[in-house]
Amino acid sequence: FFYLGEERARKLISRILAMDEEEVRLLLGQILREFSTRHRSITTILMRHYQKVAHLVQELNHTESVSEYRKLLIGCYFTMEYAIESAALFNPSVVEDPDQTNLEEGQKQVIISLRATGEGHISSLVFRRAIIDRNNEIIMQEPGFLVDEAEVVRDHLYLKKRFVSKLMEMEVPADIYSLVLDKLPEEFTYDQIRECTLSLINGNNQLPINKRVAVEEILWLADSYTRIRFSLDTDLSERVIFPISRYEKNGIEDARFVKFTNDNGESVYYATYTAYDGYTI
C-alpha cells in the first residue's frame, strides 16, 4: 500500500474521478496487462488498497457512483511494486517442518525463516523449505515465483481489565491510560481504542512529550493483538510478512521460531522478532 498523506491522496483521487470512463478502462487495461503475470490476484490487491482510501472517495464524490473499473484504477495509484529481497536475504533461523512426509530415511524437512531486505532497506520476514539429509547436508527447495502479502485481521475484542493489567506491567502511569480507557466500555474493539488514542495525541498539542510517549505505548499494546492470514493456495515460500503497525514501519526482522507441544498433543509455533519504527527498537 503506497500512501503519502491525505492531502496528496485527495488531489490524486480528484484527478481520477475527473477522467471519463473510456479513459479509465483503457488505462486500467494497460496496467493489468503489464502486472497481472507478476502478481497473484492483482485485482484483489488493487481493490483492497482502494478500500483503504474509499472514505476519501466518498467525501469527494457525493452524487455519482464509482464504477468497478474506476475503483481498481484508484487502487493502482495507491499500490507500489516492491522488490522484497533486492538488498539482502540473510539471518536464517530453522525449525522442524510439521510435514515430514515423502522423505527418505535419515532426512528431516525444515522451515527456514529469513530476514529479507528490500528497497529503502525495509526488512520483512520470508520463508523457505529445505531438507537436511543423513550427512547433515542442507538441500534448499526452489521457492515459488509469486509473492503473497498477508491479510491483516483486527477482530480482537479487548477486555479492559486485562488490558489495564498489561499496561501496569509496562509501567504506563494510571493517570495517562485512564485518559483513554475511561472513554471505552468494558469490552472494546481495535478501532475504538485507536480512535480514542489518536484523538488524544492529535488533539492535544500541549501534551508533554513524556505523556505523549506513554499514550503511544497504549496504541502499541493494542497493535500487538493482530492476526494475519494467507490464502490457502499459496506456498510457504511465497508468503511474506511485512511490517503491520506504525511501530514496525521501518522493518521487522530476525524471527526465531520455536515449536511448543501442548498437553493435548497439539503443536504451536512461537517466535520473537525485532521491530523498528525509525526511533525505537
What are these regions (language model features)?
Residues 1-281:
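Beta-propeller domains
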